[in-house]
Amino acid sequence: MAVDVLLGLQWGDEGKGKVVDVLAPKYDYVARFQGGPNAGHTLIFDGHKVVLHQIPSGVFRSNITNLIGNGLVLDVIALFEKEIDKLEAFKLNLNKNLFISKKAALILPSHVELDKAYEAAKGAGKIGSTLRGIGPTYTDKVSRHGLRVGDILSPDFMDKYNKLVDQHKQILDFHKHDYSEMKEREDLFFKYIDRLRKMNLVDSEYFINDAIQSKKTILAEGAQGSLLDIDFGSYPFVTSSSTMVAGACTGLGIAPKHIGNVFGIFKAYCTRVGSGPFPTELHDAVGEEIRKQGNEFGSTTGRPRRCGWLDLPALKYACMINGVSHLLMMKADVLNAFEELQVCTHYKLGNGDIVDTLPYDMCTNDLTPVYKTLKGWNQDLSNCETFDSLPQALLDYSAFIEAELGLPITLISIGPDRKETLIKDFSFITA
């Protein structure tokens, strides 16, 4: 059975958590394959709003097995305090349906301090880190001296921990960074490490491949967005992991031949949190209105998101590098109040060239979006229950995007609740 992959096509915050929750009944397994507590997947259902950071978004479906894969970096404090303990109110049986890879990297308290020190040292060149210790943890992983979840089962775990933290303290001292409060976080860290030992810790590559061989339906849930990918994003303003479909293979331990559908999620407009290039960003009242209507504030940091019009060259690029098979358009309702919409179809470079491809360096200021004006629907969508009941202007907007990208839009979200999701045809999901 194939593994379907769901990932963001922009700079994150596209609405992946909601879509996973909507599509989850079609799957036996939901597996996260990269990122960590820097991601925030928001689910709204039955009057509840829940933000998941590390736990897969299928956790609210009792018949679904959820896996935190080897590609994640795990913050055990946040895992328990912000997720597991808060989920107790929903009476979920996490002992039955949540599994954690032994190969997932551990975020140590000293990693968080390193993140703060590195970001402060960059001065005006800050990349907008969430300061959750993600980058330093991935750095230790790549340099082959990080700690992994499986290490907590080893009798020499404390020796490994102390050795690594001593190295971190040398770096922190070099940066003259005050880490006097780290001890308090360490106490919490070890408290939750003891709880983590009692969780379902598995050799996830065998776990997921056994599920494939048993013909189970599997959805790989990405975090952040393709334009934040460490290799193909707007470098250096990127995250530290592979946010692409290829990351599902390395972050779960599955062969490329097992990849099935690739669902690419995008907002009907664009947003970005933190620093970095954003060609269609709006600095006017229109941008403020989009932020207001979309409640565009980071689910992890609370920072206001930068807002702008839809960027087709960037979207086309993300579809190409991921081999997207189906497009899912989110937050169409945010644009309800606009009589006209702008869509970026090309970029004008500083030398006058007009292109529809992403330049090597998007961080230069000589890139101007070229827009096409489309008619807005300028009406409320709350009474729309099917694709056919959507206003013609929204259907035209959708059709224009489909024609430009050469891919079908099979889902349109018209509100935050799981019920406010219109699916053209469920047959596109693996049966």
From Swiss-Prot:
Its cofactor is Mg(2+). It is found in: Cytoplasm. It catalyses: IMP + L-aspartate + GTP = N(6)-(1,2-dicarboxyethyl)-AMP + GDP + phosphate + 2 H(+). It comes from the Bacteria. Mg(2+) binds at residues 13, 40. InterPro entries: Adenylosuccin_syn_GTP-bd, Adenylosuccin_syn_Lys_AS, Adenylosuccinate_synth_dom1, Adenylosuccinate_synth_dom2, Adenylosuccinate_synth_dom3, Adenylosuccinate_synthetase, P-loop_NTPase. GO terms for molecular function: adenylosuccinate synthase activity; GTP binding; magnesium ion binding. Gene3D superfamilies: Adenylosuccinate Synthetase, subunit A, domain 1, Adenylosuccinate Synthetase, subunit A, domain 2, Adenylosuccinate Synthetase, subunit A, domain 3. One of its GO terms (biological process) is IMP metabolic process. Belongs to the adenylosuccinate synthetase family. Homodimer. This is Adenylosuccinate synthetase. It comes from Cytophaga hutchinsonii (strain ATCC 33406 / DSM 1761 / CIP 103989 / NBRC 15051 / NCIMB 9469 / D465). The gene is purA.
